[in-house]
Amino acid sequence: MDASYTGPKLGDGVSPPITMGFIMEVMDYFKQQKILHRKYVIQILLQAKEYFKSVSSLLNLRLPEDTSGKVGHFIVCGDTHGQFYDLCNIFNIGGLPSPDNPYLFNGDFVDRGSVSFETVMLLILFKLQNPLALYMLRGNHETKNMNKIYGFEGEVKHKYDQTVMNLFTAVFNELPLAAVIQDSVFVVHGGLSTDTSAMTLEAISSIQRSREPPESGLMSDLLWSDPQQFPGRLPSKRGVGYSFGPDYTKNFLEKNNLKLLVRSHEVKQEGYVVEHDGKCITIFSAPNYCDQMGNKGAFIKFYENMEPTFTQFDAVPHPNVPPMQYASSMLY
């Protein structure tokens, strides 16, 4: 290792333990716009790939309980899109991730915001430090094609190289696709498939996910679909997935014995929106999205009764690193 590197240091070996002290050092180092040593980045990503490979495509999550049986809470966040300083603010407001204060991040950690590397790396570090403290689901931006166009690949190659980018792609291919909290709330990045015969918890849990999402089918619908206000379905304006009506949400929840659908994937002015007769929530956690939307961010906290409570927040100041700084010239 170059003697000039004075940043946070991990132990030696293939899988050195990641401590909370190391994470706090890294968070502070990133806030100063400094670059974590490549050796550690590779060690961390290799650990992450092995960890995510070992979990199901559908996570079954429980609210934490203390030794007396008292039930705690769960925090669900939406898109963060490389807005690292706003992610740090989420942890200032909601508390750091821990088994007693668990978080679920619902995809789209990267792209558009130009501090995407630091954003996703911080989430991965919390995940590896204690798997019960933080959970990550795949979004449509945790994919090779999107990363090529919307900035993450350009950012990683600017800060590191293609080898590191290839490792991120391998990690993203192993991320789970959906979660059920307390047998009650279904969380997914995009939305529902309108192929109702395929849209079951059993089918989701058996998806062979270690790949780029195909152009159509259940996996891509989960990542890309959006709710619409009127019943029925339409091909999505995005070109992938569908728009699904309240009838699809009601049918899916009833068929699978669930109460609520939580999804992200769309910026909302207040940081969240409740629709489909209260059965579908969109949560979005990147305030003043791309430095221009003026929206609030929000997260959801679920307590024992599993009723959603919302916390809204505004964007915090950040260094002058413009969004889309590393995006593909194909966009211009």
Regions found by a protein language model. Give the residues of each.
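Feature recognizes metal-dependent phosphohydrolase scaffolds
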Residues: 1-332
